[in-house]
């Protein structure tokens, strides 16, 4: 369906309408165009040649528009001058071997096609039909199916004049030349207008397609470039976030313990979690791919790039010192209100790895209660190497210890 829809969009309705109108005009051009015929006939009388020439004929609609010449011949019987009978014959002089032209009268109850075909079957090179009436009025005949026989119409007066010459014993020869092309000036201008409109619409369609394709290519390229840059910045920002290992005894493992908001799996001892700038934490293997694509906390939508100042550095071109969460190893006080702002409950917050009722002494590490070790000697906080994440194998490993 998508491919079909795309094809339909490539040929809009105005484009198809103009094309149909152009084809219609071209088909009507032949019907509205009229070709005249220059007729030159001559005869010999008293050792002198007489003749007449003029644009007195009209080619038929289905006639070849070409030159024809020969001896003018009438049907043998005056009753058959219309050539509507199958037994019609023409009075071709004996011994005449050249081309001849049949002169036939209009009417008689048969069609122009029948008249022309009967004359052509008997050897006529061309057919001249003279009109009825009392003047030289002519029109364009319709005679489909006459193949390559040249057919023209002349007026009644001129036709009877030639008939009288032949009946008087004169041998009349005729040359039919192609005259001028006549047509409605409105038809010519309409064809010109439709043709110009067709090419304008075609050029506009092609131009718009090129512009749209180039613009879409530029936008796609810019978007891909931006995504690569943001992914690189996210990779840099992830490297500045802390990693912690959950150990037996942490509050997050208790009866009210929470689960990872990404994979919906409960936390277990030895799970490695990554702590975001908003103090929400998640499984490292769950949150790292998420941050590479979205760069925000799944819980509160906090943007890690803006929180760490990386995005502003890229846009403003200034160098800003970025304190990481892992660099704040000592805090004098911890405000309960700050913890409530970051996580209203122990669910999916850094407070869930701490005792809710414990007091934090001055100089005590902020993550002192993240790992509980049942030994009297020391409490150890382990920061895992980033080698667990293939994207950060080049970073260093830091181990911090605190005396209880």
From Swiss-Prot:
Keyword Acyltransferase assigned: no
Intrachain S-S bonds: none
Pfam families found in the cross-reference section: PA, zf-RING_2
Keywords on record: Cytoplasm, Membrane, Metal-binding, Signal, Transferase, Transmembrane, Transmembrane helix, Ubl conjugation, Ubl conjugation pathway, Zinc, Zinc-finger
Enzyme class: transferase
Transmembrane segment boundaries: 191-211
A biological process from GO: protein ubiquitination
EC number(s) reported in the record: 2.3.2.27
Localization in the cell: Endomembrane system; Cytoplasm, Perinuclear region
Keyword Phosphoprotein: no
UniProt membrane topology term: Single-pass membrane protein
Gene3D superfamilies listed in its UniProt record: 3.50.30.30, Zinc/RING finger domain, C3HC4 (zinc finger)
Reaction it catalyzes: S-ubiquitinyl-[E2 ubiquitin-conjugating enzyme]-L-cysteine + [acceptor protein]-L-lysine = [E2 ubiquitin-conjugating enzyme]-L-cysteine + N(6)-ubiquitinyl-[acceptor protein]-L-lysine
Signal peptide annotation: 1-31
Protein name according to UniProt: E3 ubiquitin-protein ligase RNF128
Gene name per UniProt: rnf128
């Amino acid at each position: 369906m998508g491919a079909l829809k795309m094809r339909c969009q490539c040929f809009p309705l105005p484009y198809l309408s103009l094309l149909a109108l152009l084809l219609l005009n071209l088909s009507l051009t032949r019907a509205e165009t009229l070709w005249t015929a220059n007729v030159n006939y001559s005869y010999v009388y008293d050792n002198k040649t007489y003749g007449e020439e003029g644009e007195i004929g009209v080619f038929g609609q289905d006639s070849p528009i070409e030159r024809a010449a020969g001896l003018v011949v009438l049907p043998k019987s005056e009753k058959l001058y219309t050539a509507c009978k199958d037994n019609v014959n023409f009075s071709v002089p004996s011994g005449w071997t050249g081309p001849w032209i049949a002169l036939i009268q209009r009417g008689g109850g048969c069609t122009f096609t029948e008249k022309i075909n009967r004359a052509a079957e008997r050897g006529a090179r061309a057919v001249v039909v003279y009109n009825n009436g009392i003047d030289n009025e002519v029109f364009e005949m319709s005679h489909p199916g006459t193949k390559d026989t040249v057919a023209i119409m002349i007026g009644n007066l001129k036709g009877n004049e030639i008939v009288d010459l032949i009946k008087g014993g004169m041998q009349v020869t005729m040359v039919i030349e192609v005259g001028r092309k006549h047509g409605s000036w409105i038809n010519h201008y309409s064809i010109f207008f439709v043709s110009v409109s067709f090419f304008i619409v075609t050029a506009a369609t092609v131009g718009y397609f090129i512009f749209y394709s180039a613009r879409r290519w530029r936008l796609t390229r810019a978007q891909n470039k931006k995504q690569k840059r943001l992914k690189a910045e996210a990779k840099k920002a992830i490297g500045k976030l802390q990693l912690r290992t959950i150990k037996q005894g942490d509050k997050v493992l208790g009866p009210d313990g929470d689960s990872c908001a990404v994979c919906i799996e409960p936390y277990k001892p030895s799970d490695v979690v990554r702590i975001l700038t908003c103090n929400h934490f998640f499984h490292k293997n769950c949150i790292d791919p998420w941050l590479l694509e979205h760069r925000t906390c799944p819980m509160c939508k906090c943007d890690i790039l803006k929180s760490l100042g990386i995005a502003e550095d890229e846009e403003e071109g200034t160098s800003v010192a970025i304190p990481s969460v892992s660099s704040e190893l000592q805090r004098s006080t911890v405000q309960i209100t700050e913890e409530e702002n970051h996580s209203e409950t122990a669910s999916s917050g850094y407070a869930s790895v701490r005792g809710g009722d414990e007091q934090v002494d001055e100089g005590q590490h902020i993550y002192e209660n993240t790992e509980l070790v049942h030994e009297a000697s020391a409490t150890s906080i382990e920061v895992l190497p980033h080698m667990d994440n293939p994207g950060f194998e080049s970073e260093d490993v830091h181990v911090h210890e605190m005396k209880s």
